[in-house]
């Protein structure tokens, strides 16, 4: 994990729940279970978005569980993998909101490198089994991440899409940060994601703070 995050979260790594979580992952591997993303990419979101560069948080639920999809960034898949339906809808909203044409390139690393923390609440999953690693400790860890950002950063824009992400609102100090809410971009979700205009709104909020806007185009 990137140094600024490792230092910020040092206390979490020492806690019994995290030791239990690591033990669980070792036991899964020992039992022959395939885990996504690969071990080197579990903390990819932190590695690509150092704490001092953080401007935006996009919160997802848990990693994609299909072969080759998960690479440690919420909603993102590596190049060469077809964009999942939620990501396609995100691109449609960007096109509508910003009046630009997206290439369909599904790897969101360029956003991460500009200060967008693409954080899943759960950072691993068993192959082919959605939400199989929920309730093993990851939520406690990523809640601590959100709390740390809330307490130690200023003016971060949190994009909370869907009912699960919205439950994290209580961890965020809305007097110091900006919280934008919408329905989940999944085609199966109820409510309005289209028309939320979160991408232009995020940039307006960043510019108002004298921060560089995010180039959302891919």
PLM feature segments, named:
Residues 2, 11-160, 164-167, 172-173, ...:
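A polyanion-binding, active-site-adjacent surface
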């Amino acid at each position: 994990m990137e140094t600024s995050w490792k230092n910020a979260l040092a206390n979490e790594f020492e806690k019994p729940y995290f030791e239990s979580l690591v033990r669980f992952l070792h036991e899964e591997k020992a039992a022959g279970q395939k885990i996504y993303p690969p071990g080197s990419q579990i903390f990819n979101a932190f590695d690509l978005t150092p704490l001092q560069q953080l401007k935006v948080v996009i919160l997802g639920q848990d990693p994609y569980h299909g072969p080759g999809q998960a690479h440690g960034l919420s909603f993102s898949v590596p190049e060469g993998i077809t964009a999942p339906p939620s990501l396609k809808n995100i691109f449609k909203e960007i096109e509508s909101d910003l009046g630009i044409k997206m290439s369909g390139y599904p790897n969101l690393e360029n956003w991460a490198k500009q200060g967008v923390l693409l954080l899943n609440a759960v950072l691993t999953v068993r192959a082919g089994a959605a939400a199989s690693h929920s309730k093993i400790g990851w939520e406690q860890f990523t809640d601590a991440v959100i709390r740390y950002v809330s307490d130690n950063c200023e003016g971060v824009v949190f994009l909370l899409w869907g009912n699960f992400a919205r439950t994290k609102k209580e961890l965020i100090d809305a007097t110091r940060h900006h919280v934008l809410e919408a329905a989940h971009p999944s085609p199966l979700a109820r409510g309005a994601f289209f028309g939320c205009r979160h991408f232009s709104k995020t940039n307006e909020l960043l510019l108002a703070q004298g921060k560089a806007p995010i180039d959302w185009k891919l």
